[in-house]
Amino acid sequence: MDIRQVRETIEMIEEQHFDIRTITMGISLLDCIDPNIDRAAEKIYKKITEKASQLVAVGDDIAAELGIPIVNKRVSVTPIALIGAATDATDYLPLAKALDKAAHEIGVDFIGGFSALVQKGYQKGDEILINSIPKALAETQKVCASVNIGSTKSGINMTAVADMGRIIKETAEQSDLGAAKLVVFANAVEDNPFMAGAFHGVGEADVVINVGVSGPGVVKRALEKVKGESFDILAETVKKTAFKITRIGQLVGQMASERLGVKFGIVDLSLAPTPAVGDSVARVLEEMGLEMVGTHGTTAALALLNDAVKKGGVMACNQVGGLSGAFIPVSEDEGMIAAVQNGSLNLEKLEAMTAICSVGLDMIAIPEDTPYQTIAAMIADEAAIGVINQKTTAVRIIPKGKVGDMIEFGGLLGAAPVMAVNGHSSADFIARGGQIPAPIHSFKN
């Protein structure tokens, strides 16, 4: 490595907000299944605190050694609906509290996996878990919940979609931050290191390290150097920058897995913004030539960014996974917040952007008097985009306040202006229930 590359890396960290967003340890809880819920909770606490006892210390050591900030250390676990189903309990709050207690004990920022996979219907534990979510998120600090309601292979479980509209409303009513820790997915992935949607898939190894990187500021600085150049050069510049970012992510992941004695899983290539100025995906899109995110051309700019990030990242790391694209959370990106506040960006445009990016309607505040059926219909629209396009989509929305209010979450979650929703009813549509069948192109065999 020559001195120019060293200087480049230092600049990435000091001036362009480059960091490793998360080291996430995935832990299987299948060996914690017990017909007694209290014993299951004990086993869960014991396994997490044993396997992840050194996660935070190792993360801090690597950050100090490399001089690269590692912002979050997290844990994801087997979907709790699978563990709870073996018990006769009618509420999985004890399991949520066991997760929270373990997270506090080992010092991680979040623990994900209070989850259910219901893309084709409910099993015994699924409905119980879903109905436990509002209380579980209100009475814990670090637990994150997710529910997968659709997939390209299975279609969309519209009964679950209706239920999740209601649950999001209840969660927001019971706690200020609860809805920010709840994600509804279509095509959820098993190796996602990012919260709030992380869970440890049943096809994964017993314990795995997954890494999520962050570098919108680095990409923006690189694009500043190619102002006015063609899209070919733009794409190549993003690709090369993503390569550098991902290489560092792989190094951190390998070091962490070696020191913790567990398997290295994947690097998630997602560009994840923060509320800090200079760490915004929206500003990257504007650097391409848009006056403000949300104007015509935004979706095309996002398509170029997303694809070039993937191409550069895949070259840099032999194991990529997770969500891997560009995140467009409103509350966590100062450029997105500005675009909403000046009227350039609305929900309809955000929905179009989710056909391209790596998640969906993320960290968006809507009026608290929005009917649950409207929330469910928003979930259905997002799920349809994911199911038809064979990609992951998600909804993380917070019904709070009224249009124009600013909802403060604090920390990495930032603040969100409350956005207007379409006032016409979707209630009769949502009341139908049942399953939207899988699309014809899902039949590959």
Swiss-Prot record:
Alphabetical list of InterPro entries matching this protein: UPF0210
Superkingdom assignment: Bacteria
Gene3D superfamilies: 3.20.70.20
Binding partners and assembly: Homodimer.
Family, as annotated: Belongs to the UPF0210 family.
Name of the featured protein: UPF0210 protein SUB1511
Organism: Streptococcus uberis (strain ATCC BAA-854 / 0140J)
